[in-house]
């Protein structure tokens, strides 16, 4: 029988993630307002944008549909102008849908992590970038079952000190991601634990690492065209 998230290690990771978001949000709402979390120490304001890019040169190996191309949810953080009086972006993209979906996937009530949806970042969506300076670019790649914004605090600290950071959810290898229509895509959804073990044995070392490299290369090539 095939169940969603049969990978027990991933279940533990996601459960800890939900508990962490829940705990941080509850503690934060009592000890300090969620919109006044200490900002990064650098001198630059932080802008961020989310994109959905499709690599039409690569078929999606995680699905059996031959017309399915590799689609990535991408986020960029960059030094920006102003930003002090603008509404900050949520810590997790699509927080309500993301947290409720993960909660249900690990067997918790859908509204369990609702406090986590209140967490905000120190970035402002769509803020005007600084164009008269040059900044080093950092590529961030999450771990197995991770998320592109799992290290948002560290990313924002870097950006506030003059870096640009770009990251993507490695689709089907991230715990959760979204397509351009806002539909959720889970970690190897509908693959049983036995099937996952065989899948990992066949593909993980040789294919998955190379596929991640191709994801990041695609980000760089697309970024040049933006």
Residue ranges and their predicted role:
Residues 2-13:
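Bacterial N-terminal signal peptides that target proteins for export
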Residues 44, 69, 151, 209, ...:
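A structural signal for well-ordered alpha-helical scaffolds and beta->alpha junctions
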